[in-house]
């Protein structure tokens, strides 16, 4: 039951966006439209040489792969790189509130969005989008991009496995309601996320309790 509630929170966020701003694909409310590259700074990263163990052993800089970009806030990562790797590769350390977009990857990965909650680098399969704060709110923009998932995937180019690239990402059309309205939306989303986190914690607590009781009864 509680896991179903998590989906309800996601649906609520989407419904709130549609209610306040309309469909990003239709822009029936006639908001001003600009290219993503005109309202943000967009970069990417790289994969430090895997053969050099000094680039990964005891790494301290979070390094995000496209498979970890899955329409959720990013608080932690699977791998870390060292300062030496950062200095000797095309990796860039991006600040919290950078929006990440998976440009290619297996299955449904391409086009998915993540909002960095930590300072982190990325590999070359991820676009890092830093919104111009005077124009667009990062929470509004991340939700906008998530709702354009199918449209963005269809913009990909290539043969057997179509990919996005930075030029395509920069060309994505974004509508821009007044910043005050974007920020009001962001405040409501933050409240939804707080409530969602509470439900997630209660699920984790319940699973921990059940595991301990199973261990008690069967060992």
Predicted regions and their residues:
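Non-catalytic DNA-recognition/assembly elements of restriction-modification systems
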Residues: 4, 8-46, 171-183, 190-219
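Short amphipathic alpha-helical signal-transduction/dimerization elements
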Residues: 145-149, 153
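Short coil/turn segments at secondary-structure boundaries
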Residues: 29-32, 49-56, 156-158
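A short beta-sheet element
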Residues: 65-66, 82-146, 165
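A short glycine-rich beta-alpha junction/loop motif
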Residues: 119-127, 158-183
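Sequence-specific dsDNA recognition surfaces
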Residues: 37-52, 67-96, 122
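Short proline/glycine-enriched turn/loop segments at secondary-structure junctions
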Residues: 53-54, 116-117, 132, 160-164, ...
């Amino acid at each position: 039951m509680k896991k179903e509630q998590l989906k309800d929170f996601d649906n609520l966020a989407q419904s709130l966006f549609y209610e306040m701003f309309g469909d990003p694909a239709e822009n029936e409310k006639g908001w001003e439209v600009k290219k993503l590259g005109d309202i943000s700074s967009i970069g990417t990263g790289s994969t430090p040489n895997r053969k050099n163990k000094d680039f990964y052993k005891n790494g301290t800089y979070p390094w995000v792969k496209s498979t970890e970009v899955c329409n959720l806030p990013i608080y932690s990562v699977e791998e870390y790189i060292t300062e030496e790797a950062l200095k000797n590769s095309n990796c860039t350390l991006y600040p919290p509130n950078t929006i990440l977009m998976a440009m290619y990857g297996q299955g449904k990965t391409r086009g998915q969005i993540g909002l960095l909650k930590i300072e982190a680098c990325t590999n070359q399969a991820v676009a890092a989008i830093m919104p111009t704060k005077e124009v667009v709110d990062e929470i509004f923009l991340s939700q906008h991009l998530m709702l354009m998932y199918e449209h963005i995937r269809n913009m990909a180019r290539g043969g057997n496995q179509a990919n996005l690239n930075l030029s395509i990402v920069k060309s994505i059309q974004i509508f821009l309601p007044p910043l005050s309205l974007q920020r009001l939306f962001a405040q409501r989303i933050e409240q939804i996320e707080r409530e969602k986190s509470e439900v997630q914690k209660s699920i984790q607590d319940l699973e921990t309790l059940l595991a301990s009781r199973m261990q008690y009864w069967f060992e």
